Amino acid sequence: MRIAKILLPVAKLFPLDYLIPEDLELNIGDLVVVPFRNKELTGIVWELVSNSEAKKIKTIRVKVPLNLNITSEVLELIKWMSSYYMSELGSIAKLVLPMDIAEKPIKVKEQKVNNNFVLPDLSEEQKQAVTILNESNKPTLVKGVTGSGKTEIYFHLIADYLAKGKQVLVMLPEIALSTQIINRFIERFGFEPIIWNSSVTKAHKKMILRGILSDKVKVVIGARSSLFLPFKNLGLIVIDEEHDDSYKQDDGILYNARDTAIVRGTFDKAQIVLCSATPSIETIHNIEIGKYQLVTLVNRYKNVDLPNIEIIDMTKEKLSKNSYLSKLLIEAIKGNLDNKKQVLLFLNRRGYAPLMLCKACGYRLTCKFCSSWMVVHKATKKLECHHCGYQSKIFSSCPECLEDETLTICGPGIERIEEEAKALFPESKIAVISKDHAKSPEKIAQLLHQMENLEIDILIGTQIITKGYHFPNLTLVGVIDADLGSNNADLRASERTFQLLHQVGGRAGRGDSKGVVYLQSYYPDNTIFSYVKAGDEDSFFANELEIRKSADMPPFSKTASVILSGSSEAKILEIARDMVRIAPKANVKILGPASSLMSKLAGKYRYRILIIANKKFNLQKYLKFWLSLIKIPSFCHLKIDIDPKSFY
């Protein structure tokens, strides 16, 4: 009897046994169509065996035509992810095969490489970087100041790999970043790269998967899920803005796409290049211990000057009511506009105001399903929870004490900054970019096009605007609240604040005119600002690493979070306490249980247990044993987060 264990792209499923028809020859990695419940699915031949313990075995229908199969390297990646992130194989297979590709033949357009393309001249510093990269045999970080030409360096590497007939993957934390890179890519290489993200249609994704499996697709630019594409001939993986938290998936399988891509590069024997002006602490540590190599660019392309950074002490400002721009920043904006230069105002807070409260009883309007405040959105006349999406009308009276005309709004969001900017500069063309105002890559591309063509004078944006955009006529950046996020009770709060301020400041002065960045702060003596102002990231990283080491926290240790959630807070807390009580205490440090920073999310109360262990300790083996000691009731949802990035 010939049996094939078939891995189906179905969540929480392990390989299932199927009979192999007599006339069918199969190899591990082949794609086959099998009956599953009341439908047919495409699955991966995971293992070939001679017997089965299953009482009833169905038969494989057919092998997928066109010699489409999954390489042994991708199969190894699936196994590694299942083991490391403690997830079922079927859930990971769903990332590799997100939809059925065994339907009728799809015409796949082959990417034709134009061999006559001419890459621009590199500076001497960039040439040295390319030489080092060509000789490197380990993951390499290209660390350069904002505007130093990191993209041009990996474009030269792409050219080399295309000449060898290899496939290339360029990963971006947000596909919104892709617009400018795609345009530059087409200029350089004469063909359009494939884009892979959540907005690509199902039909187009099928075509892309067929193209990758048949080696007709050579270059893909994609978000985190692109690392699972079934490349057959992968030669280069570029991870741009490698420090970005968007590489960590916080729902479904909790994985870090940057780290997983590096593992994939090992399996595929592909070169790994990481790029960032503000690399993650983990990457800096990996360089220090010799695991990664470093290439540094200290000059901006064409030796353009870095912007000056000024700290504005907001405790000395006498702001009028509903005003959030300091006099110094307003005067700087006026001067910039008079000189026909563009302005970026940055506030990492969506909506009009983050809080509405009652002046009579002090009640704060919170989400009925979460422990978060409801955000005021004036444009839509709604209150919205930015965590679960719940919306309600804007109340005219307090829902708690029922008093009329006692509700007031507190603090600014970008809609409020837009309102103030329009009042101050009525003749200027002002635009806003955030998840609310640019909900699609097409809308983002439109705004970027307007900015590049000087159709916008003042751009007001959230974190989305900090990621690698190049506007040569932008010479002034104003950070409305530089304190936001720096005082969070979070291991990475200082790191994130430094990276964010450095990145947003790097948008200024990338053309012929020198830029200036104003940071508005009520805590101007914050040491982070001194590092940002001096551009001294090396000292910042050294200090941050010393703090982490003394606290025995990553990257000097391993961590995992066990997250318990359910509709009864008392029952969830009881289970969490029982888990900690029975947990083996040798070789690990256990913190908690503690309420998550977001203690209630989508109607579920949430508690966390944090496990800290030595770098060489097998944390996954420990967690499996620990979880085997207790039965978790069905009303309690348990998630394991290996290498957690946040504790919300």
Curated annotation (Swiss-Prot):
Stretch forming the signal peptide:
none
Q: What is its EC number?
A: 5.6.2.4
**Residues where Zn(2+) 1 binds:** 358, 361, 398, 401
Q: Which UniProt keywords apply?
A: ATP-binding, DNA replication, DNA-binding, Helicase, Hydrolase, Isomerase, Metal-binding, Nucleotide-binding, Primosome, Zinc
Instruction: Give residues annotated as binding ATP.
Output: 144-151
Q: Which residues form the Helicase ATP-binding domain?
A: 131-297
The superkingdom of the source organism is Bacteria
**What Pfam family does this protein match (any one)?**
PriA_3primeBD
InterPro entries, per this entry? DEAD/DEAH_box_helicase_dom, Helicase_ATP-bd, Helicase_C-like, P-loop_NTPase, PriA, PriA_3primeBD, PriA_3primeBD_sf, PriA_C
Q: List the ranges annotated as motif DEAH box.
A: 240-243
Q: How is the cofactor bound?
A: Binds 2 zinc ions per subunit.
Listed CDD domains: DEXHc_priA, SF2_C_priA
Q: What is the recorded function of this protein according to its Swiss-Prot or TrEMBL entry? A: Initiates the restart of stalled replication forks, which reloads the replicative helicase on sites other than the origin of replication. Recognizes and binds to abandoned replication forks and remodels them to uncover a helicase loading site. Promotes assembly of the primosome at these replication forks.
* Subunit structure of this chain's protein: Component of the replication restart primosome.
Q: Which family does it belong to?
A: Belongs to the helicase family. PriA subfamily.
Q: What is this protein called?
A: Replication restart protein PriA
Species of origin reads: Rickettsia conorii (strain ATCC VR-613 / Malish 7)
Task: List the top taxonomic levels of the source.
Answer: Bacteria, Pseudomonadati, Pseudomonadota, Alphaproteobacteria, Rickettsiales
The gene name on file is priA
